[in-house]
């Protein structure tokens, strides 16, 4: 299961993002901002593009997570950002229903706290 965090902000300048050659979706700037917030505490890869937006991998307590980001422009240069936290699981774990993503997942809670404490983020929702 993927955990999703949605919020609105004008903190990021999407015009400075690299082009996503697969699909013109923004999201890179959120991942770069998160990388700065982490301060090398965790192995967080350089953002790369995908057809649904941008992603980085993070190694958290020996497990890999995909951190995905995308951005949708609403009205008046207000942007809705979507942050996805995806826990990678082995085939064995999937078959036997082990190591599922939960509300108490430490990696999810870490990113949740970062997002919740940023004063420029509004309309924060968790799915």
Model features per residue range: what roles?
Residues 52-103, 107:
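Amphipathic protein-protein interaction modules
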Residues 1-29:
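Short, extreme N-terminal segment that most often corresponds to the first beta-strand
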Residues 2-4, 31, 76-80:
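A general secondary-structure signal for short beta-strands and their flanking turns/coil
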Residues 29-30, 124:
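Short hotspots in intrinsically disordered terminal tails
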Residues 34:
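An amphipathic, basic-hydrophobic helix/alpha-beta surface used to engage anionic
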Residues 11-13, 38, 89:
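Beta-strand elements of well-folded, non-transmembrane domains
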Residues 99-127:
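Intrinsically disordered, low-complexity regulatory regions enriched in serine/threonine/proline
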Residues 41-55, 117-127:
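Short glycine-rich, low-complexity/disordered patches
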